[in-house]
Amino acid sequence: MTIYEGNYNGQGKKIAIVTSRFNEFITSKLLSGAEDMLIRHGVARENIDVIWVPGAFEIPYITKRAVHSQKYDGVITLGTVIRGATTHYDYVCNEVSKGVAQVGMNSNIPVLFGVLTTESIEQAVERAGTKAGNKGAETALGLLEMISLNEQFHVESVGMN
């Protein structure tokens, strides 16, 4: 039996972090957590590119562009969608999650989903560095592990867009 496991060594890795400006009071904390975690694990600050987009809905498009640039070993997506009084929340959450998943499945590099989808501002604050940890930092750690696993397979996928 062969067991594959990733590690968290970020040395020499180039990372893109696509971040939504909407709800920036939360996303900026997620971004800080992600950057800090990457740097702690050996990613050089100059090898981290932050790409700001207007809102969560725009994340998949720019993520796809970042992947196709072939400049990165992996991409993190960060955003915050907080339920309001209308159904807008449901549409945005569904489309951003499907879009990021589709980009990831059609990519040769890991693309991780760090978009918070919460019922309240309080839940978002908790996940941006208070009671529930920092989901940006957790996503960054997951990305490093996935980059390591990806490198273990050296598979060129056919038909990647």
Curated annotation (Swiss-Prot):
<dbReference type="InterPro" id="IPR034964">
    <property type="entry name" value="LS"/>
</dbReference>
<feature type="binding site">
    <location>
        <begin position="80"/>
        <end position="82"/>
    </location>
    <ligand>
        <name>5-amino-6-(D-ribitylamino)uracil</name>
    </ligand>
</feature>
<keyword id="KW-0686">Riboflavin biosynthesis</keyword>
<comment type="pathway">
    <text>Cofactor biosynthesis; riboflavin biosynthesis; riboflavin from 2-hydroxy-3-oxobutyl phosphate and 5-amino-6-(D-ribitylamino)uracil: step 1/2.</text>
</comment>
<protein>
    <recommendedName>
        <fullName>6,7-dimethyl-8-ribityllumazine synthase</fullName>
        <ecNumber>2.5.1.78</ecNumber>
    </recommendedName>
</protein>
<feature type="binding site">
    <location>
        <position position="22"/>
    </location>
    <ligand>
        <name>5-amino-6-(D-ribitylamino)uracil</name>
    </ligand>
</feature>
<dbReference type="GO" id="GO:0009349">
    <property type="term" value="C:riboflavin synthase complex"/>
</dbReference>
<dbReference type="GO" id="GO:0000906">
    <property type="term" value="F:6,7-dimethyl-8-ribityllumazine synthase activity"/>
</dbReference>
<dbReference type="InterPro" id="IPR002180">
    <property type="entry name" value="LS/RS"/>
</dbReference>
<feature type="binding site">
    <location>
        <begin position="85"/>
        <end position="86"/>
    </location>
    <ligand>
        <name>(2S)-2-hydroxy-3-oxobutyl phosphate</name>
    </ligand>
</feature>
<comment type="function">
    <text>Catalyzes the formation of 6,7-dimethyl-8-ribityllumazine by condensation of 5-amino-6-(D-ribitylamino)uracil with 3,4-dihydroxy-2-butanone 4-phosphate. This is the penultimate step in the biosynthesis of riboflavin.</text>
</comment>
<comment type="similarity">
    <text>Belongs to the DMRL synthase family.</text>
</comment>
<dbReference type="InterPro" id="IPR036467">
    <property type="entry name" value="LS/RS_sf"/>
</dbReference>
<dbReference type="GO" id="GO:0009231">
    <property type="term" value="P:riboflavin biosynthetic process"/>
</dbReference>
<dbReference type="GO" id="GO:0005829">
    <property type="term" value="C:cytosol"/>
</dbReference>
<comment type="subunit">
    <text>Forms an icosahedral capsid composed of 60 subunits, arranged as a dodecamer of pentamers.</text>
</comment>
<feature type="binding site">
    <location>
        <position position="113"/>
    </location>
    <ligand>
        <name>5-amino-6-(D-ribitylamino)uracil</name>
    </ligand>
</feature>
<feature type="binding site">
    <location>
        <begin position="56"/>
        <end position="58"/>
    </location>
    <ligand>
        <name>5-amino-6-(D-ribitylamino)uracil</name>
    </ligand>
</feature>
<feature type="binding site">
    <location>
        <position position="127"/>
    </location>
    <ligand>
        <name>(2S)-2-hydroxy-3-oxobutyl phosphate</name>
    </ligand>
</feature>
<feature type="active site" description="Proton donor">
    <location>
        <position position="88"/>
    </location>
</feature>
<dbReference type="Pfam" id="PF00885">
    <property type="entry name" value="DMRL_synthase"/>
</dbReference>
<keyword id="KW-0808">Transferase</keyword>
